[in-house]
Amino acid sequence: MTGNEQKFSLQGKVAIVTGAGSGIGRETALCLANAGANVVVAEANETTGKETAAKVSAQTGSRGLFILTDVSRSESVQAMVIATIEAFGRLDIAVNNAALHPDASPIAELHEDHWQKIIGVNLVGVAFCLKWELQQMIQQGGGGSIINISSATINRPQEKMSAYIAAKHGITGLTQTAAVENGRHGIRVNALAPGGVATDLTMATMQELGLTEENEAARSSLFKRFAKPEEIAQSVLWLASDAASYVTGATIAVDSGLSLI
């Protein structure tokens, strides 16, 4: 193994990926596993979560473990972290990816229950995950990398996405605060802000908003296409690895230049 390969290796490490039942989460779980990490698939959908864990175990040299998790409930996240330690003994990497799609209504007509549900998963859920992940990393002596998944909409807001965008802005604040508080423990906390990604969630959102992939890709990408989920996963791998050892508190755009358009 060369020096560069060693920096990207996650051999012997343990990772949690929330919302890993599909899309970015699933590809991230597979990517981290291919780099050598054992991966906990923390997912609210038992069927898709078990599918991802099975793929990790079957397609990589690592172990995948599904744990049913509702990130909007602190006790569920705590139980998931405890189960991770019982299974693998430690926690080195956490990717807080679980999210609900936008509410598809303007602010003046927002559906209050759905708005609160989105905030509960997309923002409060990240806070709960950070709480229990950080406690475990500190308890085991420090070190580790946490990656929160934000969105390019923090720089390029769109109509009818108020709860989603508000939550993603909140992730920036959580990321920066967690980085400041935990640098002394050697824990790095960063966020990725993807642009358009070809996932089931993206397709469902566009359908609700009356948008098409062709038009949105042409409008929102210098490459005139959406990202593949695995392209986002590769950026997660970099932040998770020692190759990004001096990076913390950052929200990094992975958006094919959307923020420049």
From Swiss-Prot:
Q: Which domain of life is it from?
A: Eukaryota
Residues given in the record as NADP(+) binding sites: 24, 70, 97, 131, 164, 168, 197, 199
Please list the residues that make up the active site.
150, 164, 168
Looking up InterPro entries in the UniProt record yields: NAD(P)-bd_dom_sf, SDR_fam
Please give the Gene Ontology molecular function terms for this protein. oxidoreductase activity
Query: What upregulates it?
Result: Expression is regulated by the secondary metabolite regulator cclA.
Task performed by this protein: Short chain dehydrogenase/reductase; part of the gene cluster that mediates the biosynthesis of astellolides, drimane-type sesquiterpene esters that show antimicrobial, anti-inflammatory, and anti-tumor activities. The first step in astellolide biosynthesis is performed by the sesquiterpene cyclase astC that catalyzes the formation of drimanyl pyrophosphate from farnesyl pyrophosphate. Drimanyl pyrophosphate is then dephosphorylated by the sesquiterpene phosphatase astI to produce drimanyl monophosphate which is further dephosphorylated to drim-8-ene-11-ol by atsK.
Stored PANTHER family = DEHYDROGENASES, SHORT CHAIN, ESTRADIOL 17-BETA-DEHYDROGENASE 8-RELATED
Record family assignment: Belongs to the short-chain dehydrogenases/reductases (SDR) family.
What's this protein's name? Short chain dehydrogenase/reductase astE
Can you name the source organism? Aspergillus oryzae (strain ATCC 42149 / RIB 40) (Yellow koji mold)
